Amino acid sequence: MILGIGTDLANIDRMEKTLARFGERFRNRVFTPLEQAKAERRADVAGTYAKRWAAKEACSKALGTGLRMGISWKDMSVANLETGQPVMRLTGWAAERLASMTPPGHEAVVHVSLTDDHPWAQAFVVIEARPRAAPPA
């Protein structure tokens, strides 16, 4: 069952200006060390950060909170599987919120899709509750 859906659109040029103006202070407030390392290795640094920004916004919407109620930017982070597929990792209050909205007997799965077409970066997040597998008899 679908528990939440969120989407967000971020402007890459605006992200580039924000990074130039606020630099490390902004990066450290919003992005995890893993996200920063990923972005700084990429040719399109601002685009990488913009996609992750959009993912955090979309995830907060899918959680039904937006960025309020104690949620922190770094409670939501984007990592990549070896295949390159992006995945959301939730910690802190975001993880608590996810647990509270997941029905008993289910596990939550957070799906994320990222895309960009300069100057736009977009993220789409779907939170799904899957029934837990019954233990083997």
From Swiss-Prot:
Recorded GO MF terms: holo-[acyl-carrier-protein] synthase activity; magnesium ion binding
SUPFAM superfamilies named among the record's database cross-references: 4'-phosphopantetheinyl transferase
UniProt xrefs under HAMAP family: AcpS
The protein's Enzyme Commission number: 2.7.8.7
Protein name: Holo-[acyl-carrier-protein] synthase
Record localization: Cytoplasm
Broad class of where this protein is predominantly found: cytoplasm
Cofactor requirements of the protein: Mg(2+)
Similarity section: Belongs to the P-Pant transferase superfamily. AcpS family.
Function: Transfers the 4'-phosphopantetheine moiety from coenzyme A to a Ser of acyl-carrier-protein.
GO cellular component, one term: cytoplasm
Reactions catalysed according to its record: apo-[ACP] + CoA = holo-[ACP] + adenosine 3',5'-bisphosphate + H(+)
Biological process (GO), any one: fatty acid biosynthetic process
Positions contributing to Mg(2+) binding: 8, 57
Presence of the UniProt keyword Lipid metabolism in the record: yes
Keyword field: Cytoplasm, Fatty acid biosynthesis, Fatty acid metabolism, Lipid biosynthesis, Lipid metabolism, Magnesium, Metal-binding, Transferase
